[in-house]
């Protein structure tokens, strides 16, 4: 059985730590110390590091881990150019990574947040990096709104039972934005209550699920009439279709603060 643990890093990052017996895999280790500390609790061998994209808060701990850990060197997987490690195993759309005999991840290209962004999809689980968050999605740093829209839509077509492990704890801020767009959405209110309780107890709000995101995430709900109307009011013009709505929402969210009204 694969155990998945969230290792907090920086202010709001999560490094996802996958363990099977003494072996472990980490995804997006922006810092080395949380990984080393967790390895000391009985997981003696880090066998692989997976990277979703090149931002430093996802890759910053790789070099230190490679230099400081005893035993065989972990394999490092990621998009081309994500890290200077000469042993980087470059992966892209459609590739598979078999981490254990019974556990394989498929690589999905999901550009938008960055052009090189990858997600890792396994049996009923997804590691989307900074492409999809709970009740939100990543900012545009390199790609276009159209690319990010297509990537989010693609992930949204995964089975509803898919557990989603984003790389940041942004849930409450995202739900504040979502609730302003859909004040009558009881599922958003229910989830906000659960998420608030989790954070008060210093617990992650994650993983989420694809079905939950279809219920609460405005970036997966651009075809909903209420979302469309809210985006049109904000833009002050008629919006032609889901991509136009998504584009307005993404730009709007960039400047949103939790106490700012959206209606």
Q: Which functions belong to the PLM regions below?
A:
Residues 1-44, 118-133:
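Conserved beta-strand hairpin/beta-sheet module of binuclear metal-dependent hydrolase folds
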Residues 6, 17-19, 96-121, 125-126, ...:
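Core dinuclear metal-dependent hydrolase active-site scaffold
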Residues 153-163, 172-263:
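Accessory terminal helices/loops
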Residues 10-11, 24, 29-109, 194:
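Active-site HxH/HxHxD metal-binding segment of metal-dependent hydrolases
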Residues 18, 28, 53, 65, ...:
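Divalent metal-coordination and catalytic microenvironments
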Residues 29-31, 54, 81-82, 113-114, ...:
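Active-site metal-binding loops of divalent metal-dependent hydrolases
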Residues 136-162:
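Active-site-adjacent loop/tail segments of enzyme domains
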